[in-house]
A protein has these predicted regions:
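Helical element adjacent to the flavin cofactor pocket in flavoenzyme catalytic cores
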Residues: 142-188, 192, 196-199
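Glycine-rich FAD pyrophosphate-binding loop
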Residues: 22-42
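N-terminal Rossmann-like FAD-binding beta1-loop-alpha1 element of flavoenzymes
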Residues: 3-28
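Dinucleotide-binding Rossmann-like beta1-alpha1 core, especially the glycine-rich loop
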Residues: 46-127, 131
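C-terminal catalytic lobe of FAD-dependent flavoproteins
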Residues: 288-366
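Short beta-strand to alpha-helix junction loop
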Residues: 57-67, 96-102, 143-159, 265-270, ...
Length: 366
């Protein structure tokens, strides 16, 4: 039996472990953090499944992977025994009256990103009021993107950990290690450490991509005074933001994307900007309880696409570069990595790319 160690127990590591364990492989998972996943980038994320909205800035490959991943998430959730939220009510884009020109620009970017006309639906104020009663009087029109959805990321992380326990996968939480620590004990290693693998990833001299962290700041608030039925994005020239409603009146709010690898707490200024923009969406948010303002580093490659690399000599597969799109694209990316892994475990030649996802398999020379 091939012995496999997965380094990194964030979202990608847990999904990879689940898929291999379901196929009967002998897996062990190692992570520097605890079972809840607080050290993972996914723990901070809003977990929106928004390939249409992200087409405004994301690469075509990321958008394609995002579209592939939504049905994959449905299948994954069916295999989890722990409750998880998955909402497929689309998303709503709104703006204040003075910022209406931003909506035309947004639509142009959507179409340039390959979003079809029937995926871009204009809602008037009465249509917003019917579907989002607490927003209808505040916004005269909006854009509805019907193909989008969201998860509760923290529920997913917990449910995946439960599933690994049910499959008797040894999970070594609070056990930080690097590939060299485990190579003598295991036949193959799969590195899913994200930003934690920066030194190892960038040490591969023959490979062109470089890994860095991009900082994000996300607030969580609680208020029973507001009900939203789908994620809402506010277009704004200075403070664009998204609001992702979770169960039990919790809302995840984010906006910032900072070219910094600082892991310091959020600043007063960035917190004020985020919460002021939230208050402008609806003043009832002014009475919300602030549960946390968290920061995280998203593992980002210079081309902003994910990559799957492998080395037969080192018996190592590496998955990285999911950037801020972890929940949106991880099912497609990890499924592609698992297909590569199975081929390598069986001693077969690796194809140049994965047929289903289109992702390239990059062979390291070391």
């Amino acid at each position: 039996m091939t012995r496999i160690a997965i380094l990194g127990g964030g979202l990608s590591g847990r999904l990879t472990a689940l898929q291999l364990a379901e196929q009967g492989y002998q897996i062990a998972l190692f992570d520097k953090g605890c079972r809840r996943g607080e050290h993972a980038a996914a723990y901070v994320a809003a977990a929106m499944l928004a390939p249409a909205a992200e087409a405004v800035e994301a690469t075509p490959e990321v958008v394609r992977l995002g579209r592939q991943s939504i049905p994959l998430w449905r299948g994954i959730r069916c295999r989890l025994n722990t409750h998880t939220m998955m909402q497929e009510n689309g998303s709503l884009i709104v703006w204040h009256g003075q910022d209406k020109p931003l909506s035309s620009e947004f639509v142009r970017h959507l179409k340039r990103g390959g979003v079809a006309d029937d995926e871009i639906v204009r809602w008037r104020a009465d249509e917003i009021a019917e579907r989002e009663p607490q927003l209808g009087r505040r916004f005269s029109d909006g854009i509805y993107l019907p193909t989008e959805g969201q998860l509760d990321g923290r529920q997913i992380l917990s449910a995946l950990a439960d599933a690994l326990d049910e499959l008797n996968v040894p999970c070594h939480w609070e056990h930080e290690c690097v590939p060299e620590d485990l190579q003598a004990q295991y036949d193959w290693l799969i590195d899913c450490r994200g930003y934690g693998a920066k030194t190892a990833w960038n040490a591969s001299a023959e490979h062109g991509s470089t890994l860095r962290g991009i900082r994000g700041e996300v607030a969580r608030v609680y208020t029973p005074e507001i009900t939203l039925n789908r994620p809402v994005r506010l277009l704004h020239p200075r403070y664009p933001l998204y609001i992702a409603p979770k169960e039990n009146h919790v809302f995840v709010i984010g906006a910032t994307q900072i070219e910094s690898e600082s892991q310091a707490p959020a600043s007063v200024r960035s917190g004020l900007e985020l919460l002021s923009a939230l208050y402008a969406v609806h003043p009832a948010f002014g009475e919300a309880d602030i549960l946390e303002i968290a920061t995280g580093l998203r593992p980002t490659l210079n081309h902003h696409n994910p990559e799957i690399r492998y080395s037969r000599k080192r018996r190592l597969i590496e998955i990285n570069g999911l950037f801020r799109h972890g929940f949106m694209i991880s099912p497609a990316v990890t499924a592609a990595a698992v297909r590569l892994a199975v081929a390598l475990f069986d001693g077969k030649d690796a194809p140049e790319r994965d047929e289903e996802s289109g992702l390239a398999y990059i062979r390291r020379q070391d």
